[in-house]
């Protein structure tokens, strides 16, 4: 019998066996080859010693219960190794099933997070008890990595909750529940408040249920809510894929489709066949490119970014105690709330007490909503609000060890507000400017301590957007960069680090996406087709509606400033076909965007979109083309948007504005809505059909048809010729 290396067997004198999950080679337990072998050995021993066993408790020696599949293994799966993955997965499922049907009570004592494979192990137990530990989460988030639960999660949640609830509450959204919410939604049976109580409750269940079995193994069991064999359920079945398509906007996310198929098909067959169906759909996803893209971005890249891969080494952390937020408008109010929520005292300053109080009112509104929805208590909300002091008096900023300026995008105004307070705050206070486009090096000229000056580009709405783009100016010191990084992590956001340049990374690259969509309008392409192309490419916001939200005048202002800067430096402005469209929209038609009541869309008196402006078809046509929407392939529309952002990102690497592939991928997804299925803007190139050579060939084809802006940069061509990928691996 194979020895168990990752599962410890502990048996007391009452006949209760505790299986302690404890991989000696990892900080967290995962469903790797060592676990598979250990599970097989443990299963054989349980069956051999069945008569001396009264019950089984499954728990963990780690801080978390079980972390799920080993993503380092899964990201390497190819069609050639798919059979090996299928066989290994089925072996795990068979052994969990053998334990589940052993005829003894089996209890999962979840001492920490049980996500993915961890919750699937718990599902194979007859009773699930979760410790109400801080940060503990329960659920099946595989869909967020382009996968489905492949260890029995689809099969068992469908039989536990029914097809509809399993899909909506667990599988399709990847929801991660706190222990108490997991209990409310039927994912666990009990919640314990201490580790001792956790084990005591597990033993109590064993004592009370000596002949326990799963509900679905009892004679006459029916899946809650019915199956497609039920005419009433079958009549509603066509709504499932329709709803799914609406949820994804038709973007190429294969995981939700496979989850739906595995759930519905598995509900119509016996348990073992359902397990095989689930396994095949899982392996199809694991061997595909989308899951590799999403695992790279949402696990490996995100982990690298948040762990400080780009934080200067050897500099001690200095948590911010008191922050001054200059400007109580939309951005300043959101920044103040985010800081106060993280436990930092905030002085929110504006030019008048009324303006400052209005900024605090934003936090009051958010807190009231959170209390009404049960997401916080009134006591916690009051404590958060007490940390925000609105003021118009600069002297109240005394003692602040960090400053975040969030006034209007005007260099002279930003200089003025810093000069007003730089001698009042702490003498070594970190000085941060929230700007989306203005060069940080020039802004730093307005303060005396340029070494402590840095850019923090927050995204709107600040309380919801997880990313902050940190911009290092030419004279920004390493200590300021480290402190800024730590401040972003302190307020529980994800920091990416870039070097100074007009537009930095995110603002410059999203501009390419917008320009390409607008350029297509100028070519006479049906505007609704352009919007649909963006949606089906996976963008969360359609390109023309996004342009209206930003206003047409802002990009034009930024373009004119950038053009002037390039020409003053002796360069040549490249221009873009979108510029003529924007100029006509503003100057000829007076359509400046949503705030002006008219843009690419019409708006009603309440500011609600009333449809695309019919004048777009009338005023923008391509000469000699009867129907550009027919002559320009839909795939070209999508890839023009995707490629425009990817190619400009490579240029930013060439220019040294970007220094990290992980920062580029995470920044593009979390900051500017690059489609998640791609794994980010550079992983999109890596994962493109044919790899980098395939991407280069396609870029050249687009350049030949649509303009030299699609010509692949030298760095991309060089990497393609060398057979390399975009990676931070040294």
Predicted regions and their residues:
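Conserved CoA-thioester-binding segment of acyl-CoA-metabolizing enzymes
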Residues: 1-59, 83, 94-97
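N-terminal glycine-rich phosphate-binding loop for ADP-containing cofactors
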Residues: 10-12, 22, 76-81, 86-91, ...
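Conserved catalytic cysteine-centered active-site region
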Residues: 95-108
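Gly/Ser-rich catalytic serine loop of serine hydrolases
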Residues: 108, 112-118
């Amino acid at each position: 019998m194979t020895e168990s290396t990752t599962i410890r067997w502990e048996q007391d004198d009452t006949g209760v066996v505790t299986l302690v999950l404890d991989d000696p080679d990892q900080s967290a337990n995962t469903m790797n080859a060592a676990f598979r072998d250990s599970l097989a050995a443990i299963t054989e021993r349980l069956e051999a010693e069945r008569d001396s066993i009264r019950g089984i408790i499954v728990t963990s020696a780690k801080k978390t219960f079980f972390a799920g599949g080993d993503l380092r293994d899964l990201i390497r799966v190819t069609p050639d190794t798919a059979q090996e993955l299928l066989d290994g997965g089925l072996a795990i499922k068979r052994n969990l099933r053998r334990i589940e049907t052993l005829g003894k009570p089996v209890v999962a004592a979840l001492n920490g997070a049980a996500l993915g494979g961890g919750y699937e192990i718990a599902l194979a137990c007859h009773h699930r008890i979760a410790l109400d530990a801080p940060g503990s989460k329960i659920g099946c988030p595989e869909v967020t990595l382009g996968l489905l639960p492949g260890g029995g999660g689809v099969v068992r949640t469908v039989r536990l909750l029914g097809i509809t609830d399993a899909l909506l509450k667990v599988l399709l959204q990847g929801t991660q529940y706190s222990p108490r919410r997991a209990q409310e939604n039927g994912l666990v049976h009990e919640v314990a408040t201490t580790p001792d109580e956790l084990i005591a409750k597990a033993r109590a269940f064993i004592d009370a249920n000596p002949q326990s079995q799963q509900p679905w193994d009892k004679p006459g069991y029916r899946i809650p809510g019915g199956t497609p064999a039920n005419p009433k359920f079958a009549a509603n079945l066509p709504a499932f894929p329709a709803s799914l398509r609406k949820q994804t906007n038709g973007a190429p996310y294969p995981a939700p489709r496979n989850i739906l198929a595995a759930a519905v098909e598995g509900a119509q067959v016996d348990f073992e066949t359902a397990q095989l169906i689930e396994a095949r759909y899982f392996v199809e996803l694991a061997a595909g490119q989308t899951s590799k893209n999403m695992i790279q971005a949402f696990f490996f890249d995100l982990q690298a970014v948040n762990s400080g891969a780009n934080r200067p080494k050897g500099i001690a952390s200095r948590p911010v105690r008191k922050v001054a937020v200059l400007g109580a408008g939309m951005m300043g109010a959101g920044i103040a709330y985010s800081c106060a929520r993280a436990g930092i005292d905030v002085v929110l300053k504006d030019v008048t007490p009324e303006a400052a109080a209005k900024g605090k009112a934003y936090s009051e509104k958010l807190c009231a909503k959170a209390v009404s929805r049960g997401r916080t208590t009134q006591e916690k909300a009051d404590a958060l609000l007490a940390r925000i002091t609105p003021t118009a008096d600069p002297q109240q900023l005394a003692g602040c060890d960090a400053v975040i300026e969030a006034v209007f995008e005007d260099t002279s105004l930003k200089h003025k507000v810093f000069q007003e307070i730089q001698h009042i705050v702490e003498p070594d206070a970190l000085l941060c400017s929230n700007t989306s486009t203005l060069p940080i090096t020039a802004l730093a000229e307005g303060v005396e301590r340029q070494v402590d000056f840095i850019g923090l580009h927050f995204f709107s709405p600040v309380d919801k957007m997880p990313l902050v783009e940190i911009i290092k100016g030419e004279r920004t010191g390493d200590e300021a960069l480290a402190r800024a990084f730590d401040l972003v992590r302190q307020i529980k956001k994800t920091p990416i680090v870039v070097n100074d340049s007009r537009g930095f990374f995110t603002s410059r690259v999203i501009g390419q996406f917008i320009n390409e969509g607008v350029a297509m309008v100028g070519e006479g392409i049906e505007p609704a087709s352009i919007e649909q192309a963006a949606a089906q490419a996976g963008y969360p916001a359609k390109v023309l509606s996004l342009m209206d939200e930003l206003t047409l005048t802002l990009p034009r202002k930024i373009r004119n400033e950038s053009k002037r800067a390039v020409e003053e430096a002796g360069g040549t402005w490249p221009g873009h076909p979108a510029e003529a469209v924007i100029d006509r929209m503003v100057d000829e038609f007076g359509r400046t965007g949503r705030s002006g009541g008219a843009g690419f869309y019409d708006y009603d008196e309440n500011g609600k979109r009333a449809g695309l402006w019919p004048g777009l078809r009338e005023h923008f046509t391509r000469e000699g083309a009867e129907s550009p929407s027919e002559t320009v392939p839909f795939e070209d529309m999508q890839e023009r948007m995707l490629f425009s952002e990817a190619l400009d990102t490579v240029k930013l690497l060439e220019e040294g504005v970007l220094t990290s592939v992980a920062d580029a991928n995470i920044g593009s997804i979390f900051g500017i809505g690059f489609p998640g299925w791609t794994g980010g803007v550079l992983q999109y190139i890596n994962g493109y059909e044919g790899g980098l050579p395939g991407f280069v060939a396609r870029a050249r084809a687009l350049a030949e048809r649509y303009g030299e802006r699609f010509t692949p940069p030298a760095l991309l061509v060089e990497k393609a010729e060398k057979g390399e990928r975009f990676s931070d691996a040294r």
